[in-house]
Amino acid sequence: MRYLTAGESHGLSLTAIIEGIPAGLTLHPADIDHELQRRQGGYGRGTRMSIETDRVQISSGVRHGKTTGAPITLTVINKDHQKWLDVMAVGDIEETLKLKRRVKHPRPGHADLVGGIKYHFNDLRDALERSSARETTMRVAVGAVAKRILAELGIDMLHHILIFGGITITIPSKLSFRELQERALHSELSIVNPKQEEEIKTYIDKIKKEGDTIGGIIETIVQGVPAGLGSYVQWDKKLDAKLAQAVLSINAFKGVEFGVGFDMGFQKGSQVMDEITWTPTQGYGRQTNHLGGFEGGMTTGQPLVVKGVMKPIPTLYKPLMSVDIDSHEPYKATVERSDPTALPAAGVIMENVVATVLAKEILETFSSTTMSELQKAFSDYRAYVKQF
């Protein structure tokens, strides 16, 4: 399984092409639209989300509600493009129009300046448009297809926010996976403690008035993954490493942890390692899950626990100082539309990116041309792991 995305933030559309999806997977536009709507939700989103109502068009690889095994083409139209016809025109236009929305004051924290240097852009909009988080629309669309595969194999997942702009979410003890999932899904903030909703919303409103932004830490949990996915035989086969790369590829993500993560640096080995158990009904298990479901780059059969830290959005309504790329004089950075926070949306993106990596790993491990073949191979492997 592999995919490519294409498109700009204010271009005509965003596109993804996915190759390697087995034939026979039930897939409807509504499956993808559901995830796209989740990405557009959450408290603290800006005006762009009120302009766009993302809906996917499937133009290949699916017939009568089933995948055919051919490449799948997904497209989302940018409604906002109508206001940017001159600025984002494919053909050449008058010089005066080119200057209309030219970006020459790069924003600290964005790809503007370095992208302009790398690709020799005189107008930094060419870097801004492609590096925008709008591209994650298609990462979510691809992830929605991946989640359909995982669901057919009995794998489920959730995400929730652990730290919201410096406020630590108090997680009620002994919540089951399903309870965590339900609480996060029904929260505008993707948190599992409803008692903290108003405090955080008030803080977001305050940050918005200040023209500032906040980041935080997101946790994704995956349930139902058997032991043995990934490999220790080569560095690039380790599944946790693949997940780390994928999570860090999400806009504004700057760090990844598994299990208790960086807290391991403060603990002894006897406190960190997960003791092994065995029962006739469940097979091998662990007393704890400090390592987040990974040992030696492979899954252990425990829930996968992946955490990602998202920096505050770098586009500020009270912009920081920058430099004019023509005169090299100090100027305030360009201001584009922005949100005080996009943590709930980033959680949806992270969840779908993790789903894509897992689906790809499963398809590589259990090579199958049809879903029925994949389901049988996966079921047989589960049975083998249980009786080992």
UniProtKB/Swiss-Prot annotation:
This is Chorismate synthase. Its EC number is 4.2.3.5. It is an enzyme of class 4 (lyase). It holds the Pfam family Chorismate_synt. The gene is aroC. It comes from the Bacteria. The keyword Flavoprotein applies. This reaction introduces a second double bond into the aromatic ring system. It comes from Streptococcus pyogenes serotype M5 (strain Manfredo). GO terms for molecular function: chorismate synthase activity; FMN binding.
